[in-house]
């Protein structure tokens, strides 16, 4: 597109004329089946003929409700809408081609990587412990071990206190020492 087309005309009549010219250009390039864009938009047979030639997605196959709004638009606007739809179809075809080529390229390079990944797997093998660790890992392991040891010591103290309490109940009630005195 030229820069003058991107800027847009200053008057609405110029905009309509520019849009109509663009629509006619698209119709001529797109291989319209003769006639002007008004007859192509209003003729359901020509639209069905175009749709039968192109493969359709399930969304395109779904029945489309008649919209009174579109039918109430002027013919020049209908022509622009038709031109935009055709341009969108072209864009969709290009995008589909890109996706297919991209998938083929991914597959090609995945096949190239397979031997390398197999060698890496062979060298690394299964997860094995190694003789060295990173400094951060050592600190984390020490903290974890300290927490476990503290937890075990607390459990042992609680068990000892529970046993002492059970033994004290069996002994004379006056012989008990307060908890503060035991420590």
Curated annotation (Swiss-Prot):
GO terms for cellular component: nucleus. SUPFAM superfamilies: NAP-like. It is found in: Nucleus. Residues 7-21, 28-49 have a biased composition (Low complexity). Residues 135-161 have a biased composition (Acidic residues). Residues 1-71, 135-183 are annotated as: Disordered. GO terms for biological process: nucleosome assembly. Its main location: nucleus. Keywords: Coiled coil, Nucleus. Residues 168-183 have a biased composition (Basic and acidic residues). Residues 81-107 form a coiled coil. Pfam families: NAP (PF00956). Belongs to the nucleosome assembly protein (NAP) family. This is Nucleosome assembly protein 1-like 5. The lineage of its organism: Eukaryota, Metazoa, Chordata, Craniata, Vertebrata.
């Amino acid at each position: 597109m030229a820069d003058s087309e991107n800027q847009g005309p200053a008057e609405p009549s110029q905009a309509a004329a520019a849009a109509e010219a663009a629509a006619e250009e698209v119709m001529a390039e797109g291989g319209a089946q003769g006639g002007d864009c008004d007859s192509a938009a209003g003729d359901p047979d020509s639209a069905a003929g175009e749709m039968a030639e192109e493969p359709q997605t399930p969304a395109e196959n779904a029945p489309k409700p008649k919209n009174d709004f579109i039918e109430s638009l002027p013919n020049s606007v209908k022509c622009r809408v038709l031109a935009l739809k055709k341009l969108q179809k072209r864009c969709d075809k290009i995008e589909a081609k890109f996706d297919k080529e991209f998938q083929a390229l991914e597959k090609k390079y995945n096949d190239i990587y397979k031997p390398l990944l197999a060698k890496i797997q062979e060298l690394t093998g299964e997860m094995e412990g190694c003789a060295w660790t990173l400094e951060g890992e050592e600190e984390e392991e020490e903290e974890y071990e300290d927490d476990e040891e503290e937890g075990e010591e607390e459990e042992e103290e609680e068990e000892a206190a529970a046993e002492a309490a059970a033994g004290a109940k069996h002994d004379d009630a006056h012989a008990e020492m307060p908890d503060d005195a035991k420590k």
